[in-house]
Amino acid sequence: LVQAACELGYSGIEAMSMIPGTVGAAPVQNIGAYGQDISKVIEHVEAYDTQTGDLVKITKPEMQMGYRHTRFNYGSDAGRFVILSVTIRLCKGCLQPPFYNSLQRYVENIHETNFSPENIRRMICEIRKEKLPDPAEIASAGSFFKNVYVDQAEADAAEARGIPVWRDADGKGKINSGWLIEACGLKGAELDGFRVSDKAALVLINEKATSYAQLEKARAKIIEAVKNKSGYVLQQEPVEIPTGAKMI
């Protein structure tokens, strides 16, 4: 979908290039990357309600979208709906600088001035290939921790401490959890059979671990290190499926 939209010159989802998964999963977690997220372009979804057996239309306000948080993955409705179709509204045009930090650095390093959706997609793909392991070759769940969202006062305080903050239009901000992990000296570290990626500290790679207990230990060590260093408590992004859970 992202590729097709970019080839047609539509903007709004180009920064979400190479996010694994299907379109139906996009509104469940309110996926996003490099300053864009699906909540900014989604209009409505059509879904199958597993409780009533009905086909329903759910509008954006009804989805209760926040950062990696929606009605579909949190609260009493978590897992209730099977997304059948997604309607989004894109626009003709281009993203304009300043971009999300890592994209901005990439643009400046290569002196790029073409910000068409197709070219932004190309650059995002290059960045992701450089930073993230190929899931077909190396086992990981992608970004293992959510970034930290802060209000305006908290964002001001973070910047005063030298912590980079990506600001929203309303002054609120997002702190890259990978930066916080790297600041603890954990980039490339081996923890209980897992390795913190030496390319992107948000990625936890399974090198030798054979049990969930090892994952628990590695996760706890990272969370504790970041809390002690910066005061922020990281939250896991991948959803855990309990043993024996019924799958639809």
Model-derived segments and their meaning:
Residues 7, 212-218:
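Beta-rich strand-turn-strand
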Residues 103, 220-221:
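Short, solvent-exposed amphipathic alpha-helical segments in soluble enzyme
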Residues 55-213, 229-248:
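Phosphate/pyrophosphate- and phosphate-bearing ligand-binding catalytic cores of soluble enzymes
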Residues 1-52:
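Anion-binding (especially nucleotide phosphate/pyrophosphate-binding) glycine-rich loop
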Residues 174, 219-220:
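Generic non-transmembrane alpha-helix signal with a bias for helix starts/N-cap capping motifs
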Residues 1, 228-229:
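Proteins with a high burden of low-complexity, intrinsically disordered sequence enriched in S/T/G/P/A and R
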Residues 224-225:
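Recognition helices and adjacent regulatory flanks at domain boundaries
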